[in-house]
Amino acid sequence: MTEDKQQSDSATIDDIETREPPMYRVLIHNDDYTSMDFVVAILMQIFSKTEAVAEEIMLTVHSSEVGVAGLYTHEIAETKVAIVHQLAEQNEFPLRCSLEKE
C-alpha cells in the first residue's frame, strides 16, 4: 500500500462522524391498585435507584399520575418496560410503563 493510500484511508476514518443514539424516557404510570412499596421495589431493582430516589419518584407518580424512571437507549428502555410489565403481572398488579422519546 502506498503512503498516499494510507493517508487517504486514515483521513476517511477520522472524518466519520459518530452520533449519540436517541434516548427514551421510561415513564411509570399511576393506578389505583399497585402498592407504593412495589413501585419503590421496581425502581430500586430494575432502574438501580436508591431507596430515597425511588420513594421520591414513586411520590411523583402518585401525585402527578406519571413519573420518569430513567433515560435509556431504545433497546434498553424497551427491555426495562418489558421486565416491569412481567413483574407486575406476576405480582398481580396493573402497573404500566411506557416510552417517550427525549
Swiss-Prot record:
One of its GO terms (biological process) is protein catabolic process. InterPro entries: ClpS (IPR022935), ClpS_core (IPR003769), Ribosomal_bL12_C/ClpS-like (IPR014719). Coiled coil: none annotated. Involved in the modulation of the specificity of the ClpAP-mediated ATP-dependent protein degradation. HAMAP family: ClpS. Belongs to the ClpS family. Binds to the N-terminal domain of the chaperone ClpA. This is ATP-dependent Clp protease adapter protein ClpS.
